[in-house]
A protein has these predicted regions:
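C-terminal, non-catalytic "cap/extension" segments appended to globular domains
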Residues: 2-122
Length: 122
């Protein structure tokens, strides 16, 4: 929804709820609650300088779930996995591009699959 608003190239002069319904048609999983107007209710993504920053939490959740899936697969207390995580993620800080470090630990780029599974979606 926020991207629908942020990528408009013309000023909006219409019914906000109707605009939301149109913007959500491709992605909404559940029917909207009558009289709900997310644009004015979800301040995290709709106002102030925080709006784009909200997505950093979602990116962090993807990385968290994906990395933890390695531990779950190979054993939560697997020393080799723990050492690789320490050597390739924790000890490197900003010395290399984060994706380079993550792929060195994980062997691939992160995917959303582990997060979807953890959240009971898949």
């Amino acid at each position: 929804l926020d991207m629908a608003w942020y990528t408009r190239d013309k000023a909006f002069d219409g019914d906000v709820r109707e605009y939301e319904r149109e913007a959500w048609k491709r992605t909404q999983l559940l029917p909207p609650v009558k009289e709900t107007c997310m644009t004015v209710q979800f301040g995290h993504i709709m106002s102030g300088g925080y709006s784009a920053g909200y997505y950093s939490y979602k990116c962090a959740e993807v990385l968290d779930a994906d990395a933890f899936s390695v531990f779950k697969k190979k054993g939560i207390f697997n020393q080799d996995v723990a050492q690789s995580f320490r050597d390739n993620i924790l000890s490197k800080g900003g010395t290399e591009h984060p994706m380079t470090l993550y792929k060195r630990f994980r062997g691939q780029e992160p995917t959303i699959h582990a997060l979807l599974k953890r959240n009971g979606i898949k």
